Regions:
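Residues at or immediately flanking beta-strands
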Residues: 54, 169, 205-207, 233-235, ...
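Generic beta-strand/beta-sheet core signal
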Residues: 58, 173-175, 209-211, 237-239, ...
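Conserved glycine-rich "GG(E/T)P / GGGxP" loop and the immediately following alpha-helix
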Residues: 27-32, 167-192, 196, 200, ...
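Proteins enriched for Cys/Gly/acidic motifs involved in redox and nucleic-acid/cofactor modification
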Residues: 1-180, 219, 224, 230, ...
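Terminal RNA-binding accessory module
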Residues: 320-466
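Conserved, mostly hydrophobic/aromatic
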Residues: 135, 155, 172, 208, ...
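Flexible glycine/acidic-rich beta-alpha junction loops that bind and position SAM and/or redox cofactors
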Residues: 66, 174-184, 216-219, 238-250, ...
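Radical SAM/AdoMet-radical enzyme domain recognition
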Residues: 164, 191, 196-200, 205, ...
Length: 466
């Protein structure tokens, strides 16, 4: 979207207004693939009966089904794969039907035009692209290519620019953030990067997601513990705890090894919040394997957890494995595991944030709740944006009359804990950073908190649905 906006396109969320429709697709799992296909067909109808003159399909689905998309949906005018992102303008302005396929080697940098689709106080930075791990359930290497890290200085510059534009929190992402820098010859590259980002002024927290268990080093843990701006938070997808299932996944390790790692994390970083995700119903997973996973979850006492139902992806190696688990059993196991974690998360929140007289916690204010505008949402250090629980503030006005705003850092008292969320009230608003000029950024545009893009009025005649 940033490339299009810099070129003078006016972005709109309304398909009926657009002259060019761009569908960015995902095909990582079956559900995402179906959603992408549905979106393409819906936009094809808009093109037939609306103002749109062109329909472009971009993203992961193109990497797998480039020719099929063009053959089966004649309304599609061009396809742009993950290796051709910077050629989106050729697709928009040209009359070519298919760009020549290129290997997925694209890696954006701090000068790449970018539209920030989060509220300005929180932002994501992708520090790497692709993956070299051989997980049998995953097709990321096919879709995104080999692992490649962004240059150290490029990531730091982007963080500095986002902070100058009002970001109080940076979340680092990548298919495997903990491998950052290995291809650049950096030892403990993520630890080095975090230490540098911890010096960026005006940031409240820096966190990272998608850590790979065997890449968690003691140096990384020590770095998190040493810098107050580095959130005491680690997201580490484990996928399972049964040695047999993990071996079939080509993940390695086992539940006991994971428990040892979790103990080391908690010892090094007191109060650390831990998140993971699991896959249930992987081919060959027996009831005994599932019970082993449940026993692990009970012992691990993780703060947050996501559970995914296994689904076959035709290009994944697991597609050819025998002993498939039926859909009903998979859904039942997901429900049972989530019910177990719900009790654990509730106990974890209660223990970490139990009501203690005069004790306060640092929180980042998000804004009014969608469910109830009279209540405001915030997050604590141990809550990552979009995926974890929330802190609901029943009162954002202080006795002196000051009122907290979205993006404010506040001290809060916790009054109640629920299964995944907390309730509290603001008692102090921390000083707000002074506004600063943003340098060396070709395009940064914020969109509303609900995540829908603004129509960007540039005076250009072309409207693009993003």
């Amino acid at each position: 979207m940033g490339i299009l906006a810099r070129d003078g396109c006016e972005l709109t969320p309304r398909a009926e207004e657009a002259e060019v429709l761009v569908v960015n697709t995902c095909s990582f799992i079956e559900a995402a693939q179906k959603e992408s296909v549905d979106a393409i067909l819906e936009m094809a109808e808009h093109k037939k009966f609306g103002a749109a003159k062109k329909l472009i399909v971009a993203g992961c689905l193109v990497e797998r089904y480039r020719e099929q998309i063009l053959e089966q949906v004649p309304e599609v005018d061009a396809v742009v794969g993950t290796g051709e992102v910077e050629r989106i303008l050729e697709a928009v302005h040209g009359d070519l039907r298919m760009l020549p396929a290129e290997p997925p080697t694209f890696l954006y940098h701090d000068f790449t035009p970018r539209m920030v689709t989060t509220p300005k106080h929180t932002a994501y930075i992708k520090i790497a692209e692709g993956c070299d791990h051989p997980c049998t359930f995953c097709i990321i290497p096919e879709l995104r290519g080999k692992f490649r890290s962004r240059r150290f200085e490029s990531v730091v510059r982007e963080a500095e620019n986002l902070a100058a534009a009002g970001a109080r929190e940076i979340t680092l992402i990548g298919q495997d953030t903990t491998s950052y820098g290995e291809d650049l010859g950096l030892r403990d590259g993520l630890a080095q990067l975090l230490a540098k980002l911890a010096q960026v002024r005006d940031l409240l927290w820096v966190r990272f997601l998608y850590a790979y268990p065997n890449r968690i080093t003691q140096e990384l843990l020590d770095t998190i513990a040493a810098h107050p701006r580095l959130a005491n938070y680690i997201d580490m997808p484990l996928q399972h705890a049964s040695r047999k299932v993990l071996a079939r996944m080509k993940r390695g390790a086992n539940g006991d090894a994971f428990l040892d790692l979790l103990e080391r994390m908690r010892k090094t970083i007191p109060g650390v919040s831990l998140r993971t995700s699991f896959i249930v119903g992987f081919p060959g997973e027996t009831e005994a394997d599932f019970r082993e996973l449940c026993d692990f979850v009970k012992a691990a006492k993780l703060d947050w957890m996501g559970v995914f139902e296994y689904s076959d992806v035709d290009h994944a190696k697991s597609y050819a494995l025998d002993e498939k688990v039926d859909a009903e059993t998979i859904a039942d196991r997901r429900d049972r595991l989530m019910a177990l974690q719900k009790r654990i998360s509730k106990e974890s929140l209660r223990a970490k944030y139990r009501r203690v007289k005069n004790e306060t916690f640092l929180a980042l204010v998000e804004g009014p709740s969608k469910e109830n505008p009279m209540v405001w949402e915030a997050r604590l250090e141990g809550m990552a944006p979009e995926i974890d629980g929330k802190l609901y503030l029943t009162d954002i006005e202080l006795p002196g009359g000051d009122v907290a705003e979205a993006g404010d850092a506040v001290r809060v008292e916790i009054t109640k804990s629920e299964a995944y969320d907390l309730i509290g009230r603001a008692v102090e608003i921390l000083p707000r950073p002074a506004e600063r000029a943003v340098a060396n950024v070709p395009f940064i545009a914020a969109v509303p908190a609900e995540g829908k893009p603004h129509r960007i009025a540039t005076g250009a005649p072309l409207r693009v649905l993003g």
